UniProtKB/Swiss-Prot annotation:
GO-annotated molecular function: lysophospholipase activity
Protein's name according to its UniProt entry: Lysophospholipase NTE1
Top-level EC class: hydrolase
Region (Disordered): 204-230, 262-362, 534-556, 740-770
Gene name of the record: NTE1
Motif window: GXSXG: 1240-1244
C-alpha cells in the first residue's frame, strides 16, 4: 500500500507544482511581453499562421484526393432523361439564337453608335476690336501735337535732331472762316492742325503742256491778268485735322530748288544753279524773308514779309481788310480779291521770265471754319539739306516712293492717265543722254560686234535672247567688306576733307579718257583685241589691276588746281597708284568701254565732274556747318546755296550727319565705305548684247539696273491687253488676270496668275500688243526712273534692233544713291519739272492715310465720300446682320481698292471697314473725281469699266450664286480670307518649339513654289542688324514701321519669325504686322493654352489665325486634333498637319551620383525600345507610294496655301463608277501633281477621305478594295433588308462597312484638308462638313434616298450631297484653291424626246418596253421620275462648275457601269487610270502641266540680273 500512497503523494505534489507554475506563468509572460513586445508578437502571429496551415493541409488533401473524386464519380454515373416535343425544342432554339443575335448585332457590331459624341466644330465669329473714334474735332495740347505729328508722317522717319531742325522755324497761323489764301504764293510746307480747309483749282484752264513741244515744259503757269477773274474754280479736296495742305510735289520742290537738271561739261551754270558766293554780296541782315527767291517782291510778298517780321499770328490776306467774304463753290468772283489779284498779276508781269515754277499752280485754299494751320518755311528745308544731307536724301526717297505708289501708280492704273504719266519717261531723255567719245565709235565698236556675233552663232538664238555679257576679268574682284572699308577709309576721308581734296577728281580721269585728245592716245596705245592685255590682270589682285587712272598720272598732276591737290594724299585713288606715280600699263578695250559707259552714267544721274563744280562755301564754314550764322529775328540763315556744304561727290563728311542721320544705315549696307567710287563700281558694269526683240525690262517688274545704249535702238513701250474684259483693275475679286494692278503694285499674291495659265489653251497665252512710246538712241539711258527710285517699271524696254548696252546692276545704283544724295535730288528735280500740271493737281488731292490696327475707316450706313486704295496692310469689310451676327464682306490687301460703287452711285456704305493691322491707304476723295470727270471724261469711263467688271464678276461668280440664297457658313465666312496675303507671322505655342527651323524650311518651299518678287524672312537679329539696338524703342518705331513697309512693297511675302521671349517688342511687332498668324505647336505636347497664346489674346488682333501641328512621324492619332481645337476657339483659319524631324526636349544633364542606378535605368529603357520595335504598331514616316517630286512635301503644301496656289481635288458621286477616281488619283501622283485640299460627294467623299487620311495611294487602294468587296456581297444586302417604310435596308451593313474602314477617326485628323457635302432635307439646304467622325458624314454623303435611311445629325436628316451639288467646285474655290481637278462620275441624263401623248397607260408602257419593234421611246418609270426630280438642282451646279476659272473638268468613260457594280473593282480602276494618264498627257502637250514648274519661266525674265558670261 505504501507504493500506491507514495505514488499518490507524488502525483499530488506534481499537480501542486504544476498549478503553482501555471499560476506564475502569466506573470512571467507579462514580464517577457513588456521586455520584448514587438518580436514576440511578430513571431506569435507567424507561428499561428504556420500552425493553421499545417492543420488545414491534411483536410484539404483528403478532400481533393477522396471526396471530390467520389462526387464526380457519382455525378457521371447518374442517368438523366429529358422529354419534349419538336415545337418546344424549336422555341428554345429560336430564343437562344435570338438572344445571341441581339447581343452580337445590337451590342457588339454597333460600336459605331456608342462612340462619344463629337459634334461639328462651330465656325468662330468674326473678331472685331474697333478703336473708339471721337470724330475729327479734338481738343487739348496732346491732341494738337498728335495732329501735327500725324501730318508730318509723310516725311517718314525723322530723328530727333532732324525733327528739331525742321520745325524750329515753323509758324502757326489762324484762318477765319471764309478766309482764302493763295497756295501758289506760299513758300513752305503747310498743314492743317485744327479745322477744315477746302482746296480749289482752276477748272476752265487749257492744258497746254500736252499740246506744246517737249522743250516747252517749263512754260508759265497761268493766263493773263485780264482773264483771271473769269476763271472758275473747282473744289479739289477738303483737308481735315492732321493732313497736309501741301502736296508731295511741293515738298520735293522745296528740297530741290538749287539742284541742276543737267550737267554739261561745256555749259556754264544753268538758270537753276544759284549764284556763286562772290556774286551775292547783298545778302545781309536787312534781307527780307523771301530775298533768296530769284524774283522781285510783289506787294503781297512785301506785306507778308512785313507781317512775318512783326511775328503776328494772322495770315496775310490778299484784300485790304485782311479777310475775304465766303467764296462760292465753283468761282472766286470776289471784288476785293480780284482787284488785288489783278493788281498783283500786273505788277509781276515784267518779272515772269525769271519766276521759278510754283509747286502749287492755280491752287487756292479756303477755310470753311476757323482753322489753325502750321507752315514750315522753305528756309528750314534748305538748312536741313545743308546740315543733314543723308537725312534729306532719306526724306526724298520716302517721298519719291510715296509719289510713285500713291500719285503716279493711281493715275496710271486707276485713272487711265497713262499718257500723262508716261510723258515723263520720254521727256527724261533730254536730261540723261550723253554720247560716248568718238574714238570708241568706229574700229573698237566693230571689233566688239564681231566678238558678240561669233558667240551668238555658237549659242543659238534661244540662249541669245537672254543676253550675252562680255567677259569681265575684274568681276571676281569686287569690293571689300563694309567693315574693312569703313575702318580703313573713315580717317582718310576726314583727312582729305581737311586738305580740301575733291572727290570729284575720280570723274576727271573719265572726262579726260573720253576726250578727243585721249582718244588719240588710245589709238597710240593700240588696245587691239578685247583680251589682248587681260592675261596680266587676271592673276593679280586689286592692286595689280591696271587702273584706268594709272596711264595718265602726268595729266592728273598737270590738271591739278592747287599744289595741295597734286601732292596731297588722295584716299579715293587706287592703292597701286599711290606708291608709283609713273607706272604705265596698257588698257584693254573692254575696260575702256566700261569706264566710258560708267562716266556717261554718272553724268546722266547727276554726279558732276569737277570742271563745273557746284559752288562751295568758304573752308572755314565747311569745317563747322552747325555754326552757320542765323538771324533769329528774320528767321533767316545767312548762307549761300542749299548745296553749298554738299559737293555732289561728297559722301557726307559732316560728322554730325553721319552719326545722327546715317549711322544705322552704314552698319547694314555692305561695301558702303568711302573708297574710290569708280574703282568699286567699274567692275560691276557689264557690256551686254541683246538681239532684236529681246526684252530688257518688263512692265511691272523691278528694273534690273541701268542700261546705257552703246549701239542700236531700244523701244520703250507699254503693254496693252487686247481682251481686258476679264481684268479686275485692282484685284479685289480673283475673277481674271489682273493687268493694270501688276503695273501698280506688282503681281498680286492671289489665284489670278495661275488661273490664266490653267484655262483653255487659247486663253492661257493672251496676245499683248505693245504701244510704242519713244526710242532710246545711242547715248541714252533706259530704266532711269525705276532703278534710281527702286520702284517698278511702268514700261516695257525691248531691243528694236540688235543692241549693245552697258549694264549697271541695281545693287550698285543703290550703293551710289545711299552715299551721294544728289542723285536722288536730281531725279526729284527732274520729276517736279517734267510731270504735267494735271498730275500735280491729282497729287494735291490724293491723301496718304496711315491707320492703326483695329481702327475703323468708315462705319456701316455712313455717307460715301472717298475711294480707298491699299498701299500696304490689310482691311476687312464687315456687315452687321439683323440677328446680331457679323459677316465678312471681303478682305483687301495691297493694291486693292474699296468703295467705288458707293461713291459713284452716291449710296451709303454697305458695311464697316476696319484695318486688320497697321495700314497705309491712298484716299481718293469724291470731290477730286468730280473735278477730274469734267475735264477728263476718260477717267469716268475707266471707273465705269471697273464697276461694270465687278458687277459682271458678281453675276458670274458661282460663290456669289451659292451664298446668295443659302446660309453656308463655310462659304460665307472665309470670303477672300487667303487672297493676297503679304505678311505671315510664325508664332510658337510655347517656348522650345523650333520656329527658326520651321521658318527656314517654309521659306525654301516658298522660293521653290515661286512667290512673285520673292520672299524675305525677318527675325529679331535681322532687325537689330539693320536698325541697331534702338529699333524697338520709341524713337525707332517709326523707322521700323517704314522699313517693314518698304520690305513689304519690295517683296511678295514677308515672314515674321517670333524667335524672342513672349513679351518682347519683336514678338509684339510680329503679331501686329501679320495678315496671317501661324501658331506652331508640337502635336504630341500638351494642348493647353501656352504663354504665347495668352499674349496673342491680349493684343486683340483680328488677323487670320491658323494652327500648325508638327509631327515627328507621318501619323496623327485619332482625336488628337480635336483636343487642340477644343481649347483654341479663336483659330479662325484652317489647321495643318506637317511632318518635321525635331528634338522635343534638350539633352538631359547627366548627374554625377548614383551612376549604377542610372546605367541600369538606361539599359532598361534601351531594352524596352528594342521590344517595342517588334510589338508596337509601326508607323511609316514616308508614304508607301510617292512620285519623285519635291513639291509634294508638307512645307510646299503650306506654301501654296499661303500664296493662294493650292491645288484642289473635287470628286463627284456616282456609286461604283467612283472606283475610277482611284486610278485618276494614281495618274496625278505619277505626274507629280500635288494635292492640297480634297472634297467629295457620295462615293467621292469616301474615296477622297481615304486619300486625305494618309495622302497616299497604296492604303487608299487597299481600303477601297476591301469596302467594294463588302458592298459587292448580295448576302449582306439581303440580310439588311427591312420593311420599306423609309428605305429598303436598315443601313446597318452599310454603316459597318464604312466604320470598319475609318474606325473612330475624325476629319480634323486627316493629313490633308478634307470636306464632304450632304443634303439637309430638314432645312432644305446643302451642308459642308469639315469636322467630326469621318464615317458618319461620309455615310450621310453616300445615303441614296430609298436605298438607305437618312442619317440623323443634331436633329437634322442628312442625305446624299449629290442631290444639290454633285461636284463641289464652287466651295473648293472659296477655300482658296487655284487649280481644281474635278472628276465627275455621275450618270448621264436621259434627254431622249418623248411623245406618248397627254395620257399614259401603264400597260402600254410595260408592253412598249418589251416590244422590240416599237418606234416610241420608253417612258420613264416612277423611280426614274423621282430621281430626275432629285437631281434637278445638281445639273445646274454641274454646269457652273465646268465654267469655273481654273477648273480642269474630267469625266472618264465609265457609262457602261452601274451604280452598284462594286464587284468590277479592278476593271473600273483600270479605266480611270488609263483615262487619267491620257488626260494629263494632253494637258502637258498643251503646255499647262506641270503646274508647279511655271516659275522657272518667270526666273528667266530677269535676264540681266545674272547675264551669261561668255568667254569671248
Amino acid at each position: 500500500m505504501a507504493a500506491p500512497d507514495a505514488m499518490t503523494s507524488l502525483v499530488k505534489s506534481s499537480v501542486a507544482l504544476l498549478s503553482s507554475a501555471h499560476e506564475s506563468l502569466p506573470t512571467s509572460l507579462a514580464a517577457m511581453k513588456t521586455a520584448e513586445t514587438a518580436p514576440s508578437s511578430t513571431f506569435g502571429i507567424l507561428g499561428r499562421v504556420i500552425l493553421s496551415i499545417l492543420s488545414v493541409l491534411p483536410t484539404l488533401l483528403f478532400w481533393v484526393s477522396y471526396t471530390l473524386p467520389t462526387w464526380l464519380f457519382t455525378l457521371f454515373s447518374m442517368s438523366l432523361t429529358f422529354t419534349m416535343n419538336f415545337t418546344t425544342l424549336m422555341l428554345v432554339l429560336v430564343f437562344v439564337v435570338s438572344t445571341i443575335s441581339y447581343f452580337v448585332r445590337y451590342r457588339y457590331l454597333t460600336m459605331y453608335a456608342r462612340l462619344p459624341p463629337e459634334p461639328q466644330r462651330e465656325e468662330p465669329q468674326v473678331e472685331v476690336f474697333p478703336e473708339s473714334q471721337e470724330g475729327d474735332s479734338k481738343r487739348g495740347l496732346s491732341n494738337y501735337l498728335d495732329e501735327f505729328l500725324s501730318a508730318i508722317k509723310v516725311f517718314g522717319y525723322l530723328e530727333r535732331p532732324v525733327f528739331h531742325e525742321l520745325t524750329r522755324t515753323m509758324q502757326t497761323r489762324r484762318l477765319a472762316a471764309g478766309e482764302t489764301i493763295l497756295l501758289e504764293e506760299e513758300k513752305g510746307f503747310c498743314l492743317v492742325v485744327d479745322g477744315l480747309v477746302q482746296i480749289f483749282v482752276k477748272s476752265n484752264r487749257e492744258e497746254s503742256d500736252s499740246d506744246e513741244d517737249d522743250g516747252e515744259l517749263q512754260g508759265e503757269s497761268g493766263g493773263g491778268s485780264a482773264q483771271a477773274h473769269r476763271q472758275g474754280y473747282q473744289l479739289l479736296t477738303e483737308v481735315k485735322n492732321g493732313a497736309p495742305m501741301s502736296s508731295l510735289f511741293s515738298i520735293l520742290s522745296l528740297f530741290t530748288e538749287d539742284v541742276k537738271l543737267r550737267h554739261d561739261e561745256d555749259s556754264g551754270p544753268s538758270s537753276s544753279t544759284p549764284m556763286s558766293p562772290q556774286h551775292r554780296p547783298s545778302m545781309t541782315r536787312n534781307s527780307s524773308f523771301n530775298m533768296d527767291d530769284s524774283r522781285p517782291e510783289t506787294p503781297i510778298e512785301a506785306q507778308e514779309a512785313t507781317i512775318r517780321r512783326r511775328r503776328t499770328s494772322a495770315l496775310a490776306s490778299p484784300t485790304a481788310g485782311g479777310r475775304l467774304s465766303n467764296v462760292p463753290p465753283l468761282s472766286l468772283d470776289t471784288d476785293g480779291f480780284n482787284d488785288n489779284f489783278k493788281h498783283s498779276k500786273q505788277r509781276r508781269s515784267p518779272s515772269r521770265s525769271t519766276k521759278p515754277k510754283s509747286a502749287h499752280p492755280d491752287i487756292v485754299a479756303r477755310a470753311t471754319v476757323d482753322t489753325t494751320i502750321a507752315i514750315i518755311p522753305a528756309t528750314a528745308f534748305r538748312r536741313l539739306t545743308r546740315i543733314y544731307p543723308k537725312a534729306t536724301a532719306h526724306i526724298v526717297q520716302v517721298i519719291l516712293t510715296r509719289l510713285q505708289r500713291v500719285t503716279l501708280a493711281t493715275s496710271h492704273a486707276y485713272l487711265s492717265l497713262t499718257n500723262e504719266v508716261l510723258r515723263t519717261e520720254k521727256l527724261m531723255n533730254k536730261y540723261t543722254t550723253y554720247d560716248l567719245p568718238g574714238f570708241l565709235r568706229d574700229a573698237p565698236l566693230e571689233r566688239l560686234k564681231e566678238k558678240f556675233t561669233k558667240e551668238t552663232e555658237r549659242l543659238g538664238s534661244d540662249e541669245g535672247m537672254k543676253g550675252i555679257a562680255l567677259h569681265n576679268p575684274g568681276a571676281g574682284r569686287r569690293r571689300r567688306t563694309s567693315v574693312s572699308i569703313r575702318s580703313s577709309t573713315a580717317a582718310q576721308a576726314r583727312l582729305a576733307a581737311a586738305r580740301g581734296t575733291s572727290i570729284g577728281s575720280n570723274v576727271e580721269a573719265i572726262s579726260r579718257l573720253t576726250s578727243p585728245e585721249q582718244g588719240m592716245r588710245n589709238d597710240r596705245i593700240s588696245a587691239g583685241d578685247l583680251l589682248t592685255n587681260t592675261q596680266m590682270s587676271r592673276g593679280t589682285g586689286r592692286s595689280g589691276r591696271s587702273s584706268f587712272s594709272q596711264p595718265y598720272q602726268h595729266d592728273v598732276r598737270r590738271d591739278a588746281r592747287t599744289p595741295l591737290d597734286a601732292s596731297g594724299f588722295n584716299p579715293f585713288a587706287s592703292p597701286s597708284m599711290r606708291p608709283n606715280l609713273h607706272r604705265q600699263e596698257s588698257i584693254d578695250e573692254a575696260t575702256v568701254f566700261r569706264e566710258s559707259v560708267l562716266g556717261c552714267m554718272f553724268k546722266a544721274i547727276g554726279l558732276t565732274s569737277p570742271e563745273n563744280p557746284v559752288p562751295r562755301p568758304a573752308a572755314s564754314v565747311e569745317q563747322s556747318p552747325r555754326l552757320v550764322s542765323f538771324d533769329a529775328k528774320r528767321q533767316k540763315a545767312i548762307f549761300t546755296s542749299a548745296f553749298g556744304f554738299m559737293d555732289p561727290y561728297e559722301a557726307s563728311r559732316d560728322g554730325d550727319a553721319d552719326s545722327v542721320a546715317s549711322a544705322s544705315n552704314l552698319s547694314t549696307l555692305s561695301a558702303s565705305g568711302n573708297g574710290n567710287l569708280l574703282e568699286e563700281v567699274v567692275n560691276d558694269v557689264e557690256i551686254v548684247f541683246f538681239p532684236k526683240d529681246a526684252v530688257l525690262v518688263e512692265q511691272g517688274e523691278r528694273n534690273p539696273g541701268l542700261y546705257y545704249v552703246i549701239d542700236g535702238f531700244l523701244d520703250v513701250s507699254v503693254a496693252v491687253e487686247e481682251d481686258s474684259s476679264e481684268s479686275n483693275v485692282l484685284g479685289t475679286l480673283p475673277t481674271g488676270p489682273a493687268v493694270t494692278e501688276d503695273d501698280l503694285f506688282g503681281p498680286p499674291l492671289q489665284p489670278t496668275a495661275t488661273n490664266t495659265s490653267l484655262r483653255n489653251g487659247e486663253n492661257s497665252k493672251k496676245k499683248r500688243s505693245r504701244k510704242s512710246l519713244f526710242m532710246t538712241r545711242p547715248g541714252g539711258l533706259a530704266g532711269y526712273l525705276g532703278t534710281v527710285s527702286s520702284n517698278r517699271s511702268f514700261v516695257d524696254v525691248t531691243a528694236k534692233t540688235d543692241v549693245y548696252v552697258g549694264f549697271l546692276p541695281r545693287a550698285s545704283i543703290e550703293r551710289i544713291v545711299e552715299r551721294y544724295p544728289v542723285v536722288l535730288l536730281t531725279m526729284a528735280k527732274r520729276l517736279t519739272t517734267l510731270l504735267p500740271r494735271l498730275i500735280q493737281h491729282i497729287d494735291f488731292a490724293l491723301e496718304w492715310v496711315q491707320v492703326n490696327a483695329g481702327q475703323v475707316i468708315y462705319n456701316q450706313g455712313e455717307e460715301s465720300d472717298a475711294i480707298y486704295i491699299v498701299l500696304n496692310g490689310r482691311l476687312r469689310a464687315i456687315k452687321d446682320a439683323e440677328n446680331g451676327k457679323v459677316t465678312v464682306i471681303g478682305e483687301y490687301g495691297q493694291g486693292d481698292s474699296v468703295g467705288e460703287l458707293e461713291v459713284l452711285t452716291e449710296t451709303a456704305r454697305p458695311g464697316s471697314l476696319h484695318a486688320i493691322r497697321d495700314t497705309e491707304l491712298a484716299k481718293f476723295p469724291k470731290t477730286l473725281f468730280n473735278s477730274l470727270a469734267l475735264e477728263h471724261p476718260g477717267i469716268t469711263i475707266k471707273i465705269s469699266k471697273i464697276i461694270a467688271s465687278r458687277m459682271r464678276a458678281l453675276v458670274d461668280d458661282p460663290l456669289h450664286e451659292q451664298s446668295k440664297e443659302r446660309s453656308n457658313k463655310a462659304t460665307r465666312t472665309n470670303v477672300s480670307s487667303t487672297v493676297n496675303l503679304r505678311t505671315v507671322a510664325i508664332l510658337p505655342v510655347t517656348a522650345g518649339i523650333p520656329v527658326v527651323d520651321f521658318a527656314s524650311r517654309l521659306m525654301n518651299a516658298l522660293n521653290q513654289i515661286g512667290v512673285p518678287r520673292g520672299v524675305v524672312s525677318l527675325n529679331q537679329a535681322a532687325i537689330l542688324n539693320h536698325l541697331g539696338r534702338h529699333a524697338f524703342n520709341r524713337m525707332g518705331k517709326l523707322k521700323l514701321s517704314q522699313y517693314l513697309a518698304d520690305l513689304e512693297e519690295k517683296y511678295g511675302m514677308v515672314l515674321y519669325v517670333a524667335d524672342t521671349p513672349v513679351k518682347s517688342p519683336w514678338t509684339q511687332t510680329c503679331i501686329s504686322q501679320a495678315d496671317c498668324i501661324l501658331l506652331v505647336g508640337l502635336a504630341e505636347s500638351s494642348p493647353n493654352i501656352g504663354e504665347y497664346e495668352r499674349f496673342l489674346l491680349t493684343t486683340k488682333t483680328t488677323a487670320r489665325k491658323e494652327l500648325v501641328l508638327l509631327h515627328a512621324e507621318r501619323y496623327c492619332p485619332s482625336g488628337l486634333t480635336r483636343k487642340w481645337l477644343r481649347n483654341w476657339p479663336w483659330i479662325n483659319g484652317s489647321h495643318h498637319h506637317m511632318q518635321m524631324s525635331f528634338r522635343a526636349t534638350a539633352e538631359p544633364v547627366h548627374q554625377t551620383g548614383r551612376r549604377l542606378g542610372n546605367a541600369i535605368k538606361q539599359r532598361v529603357q534601351v531594352i524596352q525600345a528594342e521590344i517595342q520595335k517588334y510589338t508596337s504598331k509601326r508607323v511609316r514616316q514616308t508614304p508607301l507610294y510617292s512620285a519623285d517630286t519635291p513639291f509634294k512635301g508638307d512645307f510646299h503644301r503650306l506654301a501654296r496655301r499661303l500664296c493662294g496656289k493650292s491645288v484642289g481635288l473635287v470628286l463627284g458621286g456616282g456609286g461604283a463608277r467612283g472606283i475610277s477616281q482611284i486610278g485618276i488619283i494614281r495618274a496625278l501622283e505619277e505626274a507629280g501633281i500635288p494635292i492640297d485640299i480634297v472634297g467629295g460627294t457620295s462615293i467621292g467623299s469616301f474615296i477622297g477621305a481615304l486619300y486625305a487620311w494618309d495622302a497616299d495611294v497604296v492604303p487608299m487602294y487597299g481600303r477601297a478594295k476591301k469596302f467594294s468587296g463588302r458592298m459587292g456581297s448580295m448576302w449582306r444586302f439581303a440580310l439588311d433588308l427591312t420593311y420599306p417604310s423609309a428605305s429598303y435596308t436598315t443601313g446597318h451593313e452599310f454603316n459597318r462597312g464604312i466604320f470598319k474602314t475609318f474606325g473612330n477617326s475624325q476629319i480634323e485628323d486627316f493629313w490633308l484638308e478634307f470636306y464632304c457635302n450632304t443634303t439637309n432635307i430638314s432645312k432644305s439646304r446643302s451642308e459642308i462638313h469639315t469636322s467630326g467622325y469621318v464615317w458618319r458624314y461620309v455615310r450621310a454623303s453616300m445615303s441614296l434616298a430609298g436605298l438607305l435611311p437618312p442619317l440623323c445629325d443634331n436633329g437634322s436628316m442628312l442625305l446624299d450631297g449629290g442631290y444639290i451639288d454633285n461636284l463641289t467646285v464652287a466651295h473648293m474655290k472659296s477655300l482658296g484653291a487655284d487649280v481644281i481637278f474635278a472628276i465627275d462620275v455621275g450618270s448621264l441624263d436621259e434627254d431622249t424626246p418623248q411623245a406618248f401623248g397627254d395620257s399614259l397607260s401603264g400597260f402600254w408602257a410595260t408592253f412598249n418596253r418589251w416590244n422590240p419593234f416599237s418606234t416610241h421611246a420608253n417612258p420613264p418609270t416612277l423611280s426614274e421620275i423621282q430621281s430626275r426630280l432629285a437631281y434637278v438642282s445638281s445639273i445646274d451646279a454641274l454646269e457652273r462648275a465646268k465654267n469655273t476659272p481654273g477648273c480642269r473638268y474630267m469625266r472618264p468613260p465609265i457609262d457602261p457601269y452601274g451604280t452598284l457594280d462594286f464587284a468590277k473593282f479592278e476593271e473600273i480602276y483600270e479605266v480611270g487610270y488609263k483615262y487619267g494618264k491620257g488626260f494629263l498627257a494632253q494637258l502637258r502637250e498643251q503646255g499647262v502641266l506641270p503646274v508647279t514648274e511655271e516659275t522657272e519661266k518667270e526666273k528667266n525674265l530677269r535676264r540681266t540680273m545674272a547675264p551669261r558670261r561668255a568667254s569671248i
